[in-house]
A protein has these predicted regions:
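C-terminal motif of bacterial Sec signal peptides marking the signal peptidase cleavage site
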Residues: 17-19
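Active-site beta->alpha N-cap acidic-glycine motif
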Residues: 22-108, 115-117, 137-142, 146-148
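Catalytic domains of cell-wall/extracellular-matrix polysaccharide-remodeling enzymes
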Residues: 90, 94, 116-262
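Bacterial N-terminal signal peptides that target proteins for export
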Residues: 1-8
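Residues in flexible loops and secondary-structure boundaries
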Residues: 8-9, 161
Length: 262
């Protein structure tokens, strides 16, 4: 009886979530024609909030392994936006070793925060903000030999003051085009509508690409995708997510590059 109640609750949650995601934007003949003059897309995978410091089936390390070895495109490279000082993240010895492993695997180490917790940078005073930026840059430089050039602010929230501080530290803000919406780490962190979610989001991005709003870099249009590598559900489904992204491109009428991932 208890298992039935749990299953019913999960089903009810899935049904409620299904109402939050609309159908993909319809591909019109006009959009289809405009896309013919656009470069193919290539997915740029990014990961927030890591590295995990867990000693049990570490999700960040699982993600790195799946990017290296998968049936879609072995050797995918990603950008990891890191919490370099959090005790359950990069501030631990295991977290530091995971960051070193990510860099050794050819991935880009980028800055998320160097606060003890996932603190909104807008809440920090000037001295605290300067301190976390300097500390985070030093943490990453100790691994890579150079300070990071990319930042994704906690909660993706910044203002003129924090943006100016990022610029002083040589950091460029990178947000996202697509999101797995997997930022909930504790409790129910699954994504029963993950396929519909990405179909819908890519169809919206497709409309922008058709209008020439996304830049072309080296013959392809990068489409930034965001996951959370500390989410165990995401880590378990990483290879499936790779296939979903390819399926999303096909369903929405998008051309992908010969190598669809970086």
């Amino acid at each position: 009886m208890k298992s039935f109640a749990i299953a019913s609750a999960v089903l009810a949650l899935a049904v409620s979530l299904s109402g939050c995601i609309g159908a993909p934007v319809a591909l019109t003949p006009q959009t289809e024609q405009r896309l013919q003059s656009q470069a193919p897309i290539r997915f740029l995978l990014t990961f927030d909030d890591g590295p995990s410091a867990s000693g049990y089936n570490n999700p960040s390390r699982s993600v790195v392994a799946d990017l290296a070895h998968n049936p879609v495109l072995p050797g995918i490279k990603a950008v990891f936006f890191l919490q370099t000082e959090a005790a359950r993240s990069g501030g631990s010895s295991r977290g530091r070793k995971t960051m070193e492993r990510e860099y050794a695997g050819g991935h880009i180490l980028a800055f998320h925060t160097a606060t003890a917790f996932h603190t909104n940078h807008r809440w920090l005073n000037n001295a605290e903000l300067e301190s976390t930026l300097a500390q985070g840059s030093a943490d990453i430089a100790a691994i890579t030999g150079a300070p990071p050039v990319l930042v994704r602010p906690p909660f993706w929230n910044y203002d003129r003051r924090t943006f100016a501080a990022y610029q002083r530290h040589g950091l460029h803000v990178l947000l996202t085009d697509l999101s797995a919406n997997d930022g909930k780490i504790w409790g129910f962190n699954g994504s029963p509508r993950r396929r519909a979610n990405l179909y819908r989001q890519l169809s919206v991005v497709r409309e922008r690409i058709a209008l020439g709003e996304l830049p072309t870099v080296d013959g392809v249009i990068p489409v930034v995708v965001t996951f959370h590598d500390i989410n165990r559900y995401t880590a378990r489904h990483m290879q499936e997510y790779l296939q979903i992204l390819l399926d999303s491109a096909q369903v929405t009428g998008m051309k992908t590059a010969a190598e669809p991932f970086y």
